[in-house]
Every structure is written in C-alpha cells, then in structure tokens.
C-alpha cells in the first residue's frame, strides 16, 4: 500500500482524527477527549463526510441498500473526497488557524479504506487528492471485532434494521489496519 502524502499541519491548532468501523467506539472516545480538552482549550468537533454527503441519494443508497449496482462506488468516493477537501479548507483549516483543537469523527483515511475495501486499491487519484488534505497531528483507529461493532450498531434504535454487509465490514477492518501500518 502507498503512503498518504498529506499536507503538514502548519497552523497554531491541532487536528485529531478518529476512524474505524461503525460501532467501534469512535464517538464515545472523541466525546471524552473533547470533554477533557475543552476545559483549557478551544475545541471544535466535526465529522466527515458532512451532512451534505450523508443525506445524498448516492450515500443513502450505499448505506441502506444491499443492491449497490445503481452507482459506481468511485462516484461516491469522489463525492466524499470533494466534501472532505471543501470541509477541510473552509471549516477545519480556519479553526486550526485560530489555534483551536479540531476533533474529527472520521477523516480521509475512511474514504481510502472504503474505496480499497470495495476493490479499488489501484485507483491512484485518491492518493493525489491526499496531498491537499491536512495531515492530522494524531490519527486514532479503533479496532474491535466486526461482530462487536455490528452488535453495537444494531443496539441503536434508529439502526436496528439497517443493512450491513458483513463481508464488507471484514474487508474494511483489514484496510484500516493496512492504512495504519503504511502511515
């Protein structure tokens, strides 16, 4: 796997990112970190992709439907990557320039893991885009067994009946681990 050559963080602030499978504990841990840090620092909490992508037809199709033939997954990856670039330059970077600590629930690593887990490991464009993305000061990956993550997701009332592709979850976990080793 190639290394992501992200843009160094040259701001006064700090960027911490949290990635992993749905149900791995990211949100719980980032909320704890936020609670501890905001006692003494300006903290800005965000998530990627933003709601603009999360509410789009293409995103909802992939999240809620077992039939993924309606779209080429790379189109969703490009949408998510463009959202991350826009969000990074217009939201995250200004907060970092102010000296804030920015904590992101998911980041560019999630886009890469999802693309690779779906069989597009040779698509170089994702690595080129990474050059315009700020490298986090610390990136956390939460690794739990797939079964544990899925059980946690299913325990949420709103996601009790959500479609989950178990094979994809195993591949995602493998890709996250590979990304951690390469970066």
What are these regions (language model features)?
Residues 23-24:
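ATP-binding Walker
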Residues 18:
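Hydrophobic anchor at the beta1->P-loop junction of P-loop NTPases
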Residues 134-135, 178-183:
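A structural motif corresponding to the C-terminal end of an alpha-helix
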Residues 111-174:
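A glycine- and Lys/Arg-enriched "phosphate-lid" helix/loop adjacent to the NTP-binding pocket
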Residues 1-15:
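Extreme N-terminal, non-catalytic leader segments
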């Amino acid at each position: 796997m190639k290394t992501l050559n992200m843009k160094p963080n040259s701001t006064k602030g700090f960027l911490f990112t949290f990635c992993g499978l749905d149900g791995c504990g990211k949100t719980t841990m980032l909320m704890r970190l936020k609670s501890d840090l905001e006692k003494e620092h300006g903290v800005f909490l965000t998530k990627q992709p933003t709601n603009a992508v999360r509410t789009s037809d293409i995103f909802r199709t992939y999240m809620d439907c077992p039939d993924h033939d309606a779209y080429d997954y790379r189109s969703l990856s490009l949408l998510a990557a463009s959202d991350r670039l826009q969000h990074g330059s217009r939201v995250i970077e200004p907060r970092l320039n102010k000296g804030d600590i920015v904590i992101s629930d998911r980041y560019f690593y999630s886009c890469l893991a999802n693309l690779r887990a779906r069989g597009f490991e040779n698509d170089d464009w994702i690595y080129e885009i990474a050059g315009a993305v700020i490298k986090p000061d610390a990136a956390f990956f939460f690794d739990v067994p797939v079964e544990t993550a899925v059980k946690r997701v299913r325990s949420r009332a709103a996601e009790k009946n959500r479609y989950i592709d178990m094979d994809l979850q195993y591949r995602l976990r493998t890709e996250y681990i590979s990304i951690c080793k390469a970066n």
